[in-house]
Amino acid sequence: MTKIFKSNAAKAKQFFADKMAFTTGPVEISHQIEKKEDVVIIDVRGSKDFKKGHVQGAINLPQEKWGTLAGLRRDTMNIIYCYAQNCHLGAHAAMQFATKGYSVMEMDGGFESWKENGLKIVK
């Protein structure tokens, strides 16, 4: 039993280290926007939802257009977000873009978390 706990602890440590390296939160992204840091924000939600509201400066790249890689940049961090915490679309997009050689992070909680934090929404 002790071996299992030690094994789980090591796996948990690695999981959370990886999670922190490849995810960021809405408040952190908002600060990056305010400071005009060089990041690309990619909204992978559908175009109708994007038009209803999105993160300032975000580029809409819905799933049917992922193959174009439109808006992604190789020289900076690309931050991906989708609908909400339980939406895995952002993670799938991030994995696909990383496979193509792009530096990526995913925004925790998606657009829903952005709204819940009362951050600026552009229409």
Question: Where do the protein language model's features map onto the residues?
Answer:
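Terminal peptide-recognition signature
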Residues: 43, 58, 97
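Short, hinge-like loop/turn segments at secondary-structure boundaries
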Residues: 59, 77, 121-123
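Catalytic cysteine-centered active loop of the rhodanese-like fold, especially the PTP/DSP P-loop
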Residues: 67, 72-115
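Flexible, polar/low-complexity N-terminal or interdomain linker segments that lie immediately upstream
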Residues: 1-41, 45-49, 123
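Glycine-rich, highly charged phosphate/nucleotide-binding loops
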Residues: 59-67
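Short, structured coil segments at secondary-structure junctions
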Residues: 54-56, 100
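Conserved beta-strand positions in the Rossmann-like core of class I SAM-dependent methyltransferases
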Residues: 40, 59, 105
